[in-house]
Amino acid sequence: MVTTKAVGDGGEDRALAYLLRAGLKLVERNYRVAGGPRVRGGEIDLVLRDRDGTLVFVEVRTRATRSHGGAAATVSGVKQQRIVRAARHYLMRFASPPPCRFDVVAIEGEHIAWLRAAFDAS
């Protein structure tokens, strides 16, 4: 039996290969921020650099089928907030943070959809 984690890890591998072929460069993988007493931590699946220098924070969602609205529909507002929180933490390492965006790679079976600027930090 394949675990959910194994499916997710496989999806991240496929998404990374797809984005590298598109010309992005891997900066970091599975960047995690610890939570606090009232705040859950966050994780960014992939951090990449686009050709124009933009830092790209990528959430990867993998589903076997398109049922229940598909993979992209599972990136809820709460999940977006956690990703943004982790990205803000990540950006603190820069004296002058580069431009950034939040992408989603949705994998449904064999189909891969790359949603550039899927959400913003507001």
UniProtKB/Swiss-Prot annotation:
GO terms for molecular function: nucleic acid binding. It comes from the Bacteria. Pfam families: UPF0102 (PF02021). Gene3D superfamilies: 3.40.1350.10. Belongs to the UPF0102 family. This is UPF0102 protein Mpe_A3766.
